[in-house]
């Protein structure tokens, strides 16, 4: 689900590209979006504040456990962290976490050369999964 707001010419170009890439959203996703849009503003605020805040806290704790530094003013559905200097690159840290803790963290190199020293955590996972990931990483 998404939304586009732009001038008419840009919208026309984007719709032309989109019409060749996909043919629409899966119907159950459309129905879920309708249901979500029908919830009250208070419900959305509560979900965003509490869910995001708790997930963000767990992601920050994971970064700290890995020795990664991060900008606490980041916003969005991901948390980026700079890896400690003793790792050669983000792949080395991601592999260590995967093999020793059985937790996948996204190595930044997959986003280009500037990501070599960074890892990315998603805040889309539920709190239980993030908490379990944190405990596994702490046990490494």
Residue spans of the language-model regions?
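PLP-dependent class I/II
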Residues: 1-140
